[in-house]
Swiss-Prot record:
Cofactor mode of binding and number, as noted: Binds 1 Mg(2+) ion per subunit. Binds 1 thiamine pyrophosphate per subunit.
GO MF annotation, one: acetolactate synthase activity
EC number(s) from the headed UniProt entry: 2.2.1.6
Protein name listed in UniProt: Acetolactate synthase isozyme 2 small subunit
Subunit note: Tetramer of two large and two small chains.
Catalytic activity: 2 pyruvate + H(+) = (2S)-2-acetolactate + CO2
One Pfam family from the record: ACT_5
Note: E.coli contains genes for 3 AHAS isozymes: ilvBN, ilvGM and ilvIH.
Domain ACT: 5-78
Cofactor(s) annotated in UniProt: Mg(2+); thiamine diphosphate
Naturally occurring in which organism (per UniProt): Escherichia coli (strain K12)
Gene3D superfamilies, A to Z: 3.30.70.260
NCBIfam families per record: PRK11152.1 (NF008362)
PROSITE patterns in the cross-refs: ACT
């Protein structure tokens, strides 16, 4: 499974985070970690997500860019993760 670090800049509305997380889930990605902080102007937020999926991150990138409140999406890093099964 691939892990991707995604940075999203968006307008600060109560429903914005919900919409971003719904798109991530509907596109088949799992949230491994998340950090959200208000931008310096207090009207925008910066969301840092680490997501995992065998799917291409390009689909998630294009779908997040279509959201009304999203101003910018950047894919910063991709890494491969291995899953261990213990008996």
């Amino acid at each position: 499974m691939m892990q991707h670090q995604v940075n999203v800049s968006a307008r600060f509305n109560p429903e914005t985070l919900e919409r971003v997380l719904r798109v991530v889930r509907h596109r088949g990605f799992h949230v491994c970690s998340m950090n959200m902080a208000a931008a310096s102007d207090a009207q925008n937020i910066n969301i840092e997500l680490t997501v995992a999926s065998p799917r291409s991150v390009d689909l998630l990138f294009s779908q997040l860019n279509k959201l009304v409140d999203v101003a910018h999406v950047a894919i910063c890093q991709s890494t491969t993760t291995s899953q261990q099964i213990r008996a």
